[in-house]
């Protein structure tokens, strides 16, 4: 079974999960840390309330964490790996894990747990090599962290050249 883990339902990913459910014989489930975006909510970047024009949960197997997570994840530390997700990842039936990002603590915990349990592990993240930190301390920490984290990934699902370069640099 393939487990896909995301922070919350994202409008441009949902059609992929719906097609996967319709077209394939691959057993999968999407696990969400929060329900952010399911109901209309105010978006600071856009300066208005956003309501998506598609149903974000219908047509594919998904569920939310059974433990309390903040409605909106605001920083790396705000979402740790829920126990129910940990059990699902450890399960014998789970063979592959697709992680959609590495921006929260829970995702790093999933990577470590996946490696310990010898699960086949994929990463798709909207990161790139274009941003340069001005602080040498931050740069060195980031290099060490990414080298460690990326060494646990079996396959990187790249999004463009800058994203691919980021992974290749480690």
Task: List PLM regions with ranges.
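N-terminal subdomain of nucleotide-sugar transferases
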Residues: 1-64, 89-93
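An aromatic- and histidine-rich active-site surface loop
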Residues: 11-14, 78-80, 96-117, 123-125
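Helix C-cap/helix->beta junction micro-motif
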Residues: 24, 92, 116-119, 152
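Generic beta-sheet signal
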Residues: 31-33, 124, 159
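A short, charged, and often flexible helix/loop element on the N-terminal side
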Residues: 55-83, 100, 137
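Nucleotide-sugar donor phosphate/pyrophosphate-binding loop at the beta->alpha transition
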Residues: 120-122, 128-152
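A short beta-strand/loop micro-motif in the catalytic core of glycosyltransferases
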Residues: 153-160
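Helix-loop-beta element that forms the nucleotide-linked donor phosphate-binding surface
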Residues: 164-170
């Amino acid at each position: 079974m393939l487990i896909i883990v995301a922070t919350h339902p994202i409008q441009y990913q949902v059609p992929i999960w719906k097609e996967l459910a319709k077209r394939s014989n691959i057993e999968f489930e999407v696990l969400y840390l929060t329900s952010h975006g399911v109901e209309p909510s105010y978006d600071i970047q856009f300066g208005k309330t956003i309501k998506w024009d598609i149903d974000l949960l219908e047509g594919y197997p998904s569920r939310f964490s059974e433990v309390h997570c903040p409605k909106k994840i605001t920083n790396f530390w705000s979402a740790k790996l829920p126990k129910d997700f940990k059990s699902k990842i450890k399960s014998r039936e789970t063979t592959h894990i697709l992680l959609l990002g590495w921006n929260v603590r829970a995702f790093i915990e999933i990577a470590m747990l996946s490696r310990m349990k010898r699960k086949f592990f994929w990463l798709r993240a909207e990161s790139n090599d274009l941003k340069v930190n001005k602080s040498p301390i931050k740069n060195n920490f980031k290099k060490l962290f990414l080298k460690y984290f990326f060494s646990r990934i079996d396959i990187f699902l790249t999004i463009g050249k800058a994203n691919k370069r980021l992974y290749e640099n480690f």
